[in-house]
Amino acid sequence: MVLSQRQRDELNRAIADYLRSNGYEEAYSVFKKEAELDMNEELDKKYAGLLEKKWTSVIRLQKKVMELESKLNEAKEEFTSGGPLGQKRDPKEWIPRPPEKYALSGHRSPVTRVIFHPVFSVMVSASEDATIKVWDYETGDFERTLKGHTDSIQDIPFDHSGKLLASCSADMTIKLWDFQGFECIRTMHGHDHNVSSVAIMPNGDHIVSASRDKTIKMWEVQTGYCVKTFTGHREWVRMVRPNQDGTLIASCSNDQTVRVWVVATKECKAELREHEHVVECISWAPESSYSSISEATGSETKKSGKPGPFLLSGSRDKTIKMWDVSTGMCLMTLVGHDNWVRGVLFHSGGKFILSCADDKTLRVWDYKNKRCMKTLNAHEHFVTSLDFHKTAPYVVTGSVDQTVKVWECR
């Protein structure tokens, strides 16, 4: 590469400045003489430290080039494997793609839970700021705030119709909200500590809650009365989720176990213990994924001829585990997150698993091959929650960075 006379002159002056400022006096005077440099104070200021600056900026640019090259390779790969640019993927295989469609700000403390409405194009977020916010995920517009709790809200579920929203809080209460009038219609007291999780049973008549008081309680929606208490966990119960038909509920705890309970008898049907730290989250596999799971894990079809049910769990041991509840066996362990796993669920197509964690990422797993197939650097801080829309191609995440992000899938 040939330098112009001006560039050569600038380079020589920068070299001279470098030699002099680093104490190479002899080399400086020889170089100055040979390069026929006329150094004066004004010029000296202009070239002070220039060589080092150029050197570091070259390194920075090289790093940027490498980053862009890897993004380009990723895009090429997506193109050849039929990404959004290549032939159209089957919607069952659509996964979230960066960058996010919307980053929504409004909460004044970490976001603890995000969920989609089952019918309308809205989603709801809960936060440590004791509020629930409603957003339109198609336009990114903020719609309203629901206030009533006096401490951090830990969990929010809708019933299947979307007319009823439940919430639970560190203020030890559970609230039911009429999602048409946006009013709190009932407050339930009964737990002796932080209520960390709540879920509405599929029939809509009862709700279940889990607490730091080590119990799980079942409540009647109509009256607000506690009708059952499930005891057995030895520590804080982090999450509770009913299965599709409401005959079983699963729970996970700081005691490092996942338990499955028979609702009718309150008996603990299975205690799943292989995690090595607090189990933060659980999720039931939808029946649409049963055949893929059986194929991927070679799990035996039982005498009844029906596989499953299957359950996912995510833990502070940084792993995700898949369980066959009927046998109590751990079918697989997915390793890849670099910090506590905070949310896990099945892709609505049944072939993939999505998870979020304190390593600030959202990950998509191809469980058939037990590998992480996509990692999205989702937030500036821990990712606390995620939800996948049942019918529309959207994923939503919430974070300690106080934002809610909407990701489009394709």
From Swiss-Prot:
Q: What CDD domains does its record include?
A: WD40
In this chain the LisH domain maps to 7-39
The signal peptide annotation in the UniProt record is: none
Name assigned to this protein: Platelet-activating factor acetylhydrolase IB subunit alpha
Q: What domain of life is recorded for the organism? A: Eukaryota
Q: Where is this region: Interaction with dynein and dynactin?
A: 83-410
Similarity remark? Belongs to the WD repeat LIS1/nudF family.
